[in-house]
């Protein structure tokens, strides 16, 4: 991601209106008229309100607590979650994906994955359970980021380089790739490795810190082959 694109993300977060989104089910007469910025389902005596707490709090201030049920999962949030309805990928329940994330065709995002703003995921790539892609992390096509793996994010400074994972790469479970590291096409990062330096294409790295232990051979290719059927929609 170019420096000017990183700066756009920084500006977006800095200038975004911070909101505390809530969904409130209520019974009784609201204190004031519902503004256009709050969604209302039902009527003035029973229904649901969806919007920012700063506005809804004023509407329900006269209602007893037993007549109000409040659902809330964030406070002063600057970045909404990604609208996933039109994405041509498989995204399982429990994945947390923030806005301004790019997801390629037939990618798979497993439950519990966390993907921060500005991240990019290539076509046919799988992000496994509990994996974390930090801000601006980039993963190429036909790759696999293993369960619990972390690709460190870097939003600031704008000049900092993000993690870049190439095409046809396997990152093993619980591996960590540090900010700015580039992993070349066809490489394999062993489970639990801590990657602090760039990884050449078609090599296997392992250890803490990770070091090249061999080049990719036919045996390694068989062990790390991805299954296309898992990526079909």
Swiss-Prot record:
| Gene3D superfamilies xrefs | Hexapeptide repeat proteins, Malonyl-CoA ACP transacylase, ACP-binding
* Gene Ontology molecular function: tetrahydrodipicolinate N-acetyltransferase activity
Q: Per its UniProt entry, which superkingdom is the organism in? A: Bacteria
EC number in record? 2.3.1.89
Give the pathway: Amino-acid biosynthesis; L-lysine biosynthesis via DAP pathway; LL-2,6-diaminopimelate from (S)-tetrahydrodipicolinate (acetylase route): step 1/3
Q: Which reaction does it catalyse?
A: (S)-2,3,4,5-tetrahydrodipicolinate + acetyl-CoA + H2O = L-2-acetamido-6-oxoheptanedioate + CoA
**Key words of the record:** Acyltransferase, Amino-acid biosynthesis, Diaminopimelate biosynthesis, Lysine biosynthesis, Repeat, Transferase
Q: Which GO terms describe its biological process?
A: diaminopimelate biosynthetic process; lysine biosynthetic process via diaminopimelate
Enzyme class, top EC level, equals transferase
InterPro entries, per database record: DapH, DapH_N, Hexapep, Hexapep_transf_CS, Trans_hexapeptide_repeat, Trimer_LpxA-like_sf
Provide the function of this protein: Catalyzes the transfer of an acetyl group from acetyl-CoA to tetrahydrodipicolinate.
Under the heading HAMAP family, the entry gives: DapH
Family, according to the entry, reads as follows: Belongs to the transferase hexapeptide repeat family. DapH subfamily.
Q: What is the name listed in the Swiss-Prot or TrEMBL entry for this protein?
A: 2,3,4,5-tetrahydropyridine-2,6-dicarboxylate N-acetyltransferase
Q: Which organism is it from?
A: Leuconostoc mesenteroides subsp. mesenteroides (strain ATCC 8293 / DSM 20343 / BCRC 11652 / CCM 1803 / JCM 6124 / NCDO 523 / NBRC 100496 / NCIMB 8023 / NCTC 12954 / NRRL B-1118 / 37Y)
Name the gene behind this protein: dapH
């Amino acid at each position: 991601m170019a420096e000017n694109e990183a700066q756009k993300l920084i500006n977006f977060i800095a200038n975004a209106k911070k909101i505390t989104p809530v969904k409130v089910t209520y019974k009784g007469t609201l204190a004031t008229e519902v503004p256009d910025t709050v969604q209302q389902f039902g009527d003035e005596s029973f229904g649901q309100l969806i919007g920012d707490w700063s506005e809804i709090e004023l509407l329900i201030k006269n209602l007893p607590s037993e007549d109000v049920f409040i659902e809330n999962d964030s406070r002063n949030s600057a970045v909404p979650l990604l609208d996933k309805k039109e994405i041509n990928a498989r995204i399982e329940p429990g994945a947390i994906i923030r806005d301004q994330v790019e997801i390629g065709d037939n990618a798979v995002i497993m439950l519990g994955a966390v993907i921060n703003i500005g991240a990019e995921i290539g076509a046919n790539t799988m992000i496994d359970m509990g994996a974390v892609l930090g801000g601006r992390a980039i993963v190429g096509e036909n790759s696999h980021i293993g369960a619990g793996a972390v690709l460190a994010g870097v939003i600031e400074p704008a000049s900092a380089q993000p993690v870049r994972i190439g095409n046809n790469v396997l990152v093993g479970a619980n591996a960590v790739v540090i900010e700015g590291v580039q992993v070349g096409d066809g490489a394999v990062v062993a489970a639990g490795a801590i990657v602090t330096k760039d990884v050449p294409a078609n090599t296997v790295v392992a250890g803490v810190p990770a070091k090249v232990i061999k080049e990719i051979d036919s045996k390694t290719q068989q062990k790390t082959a991805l299954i296309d059927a898992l990526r079909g929609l």
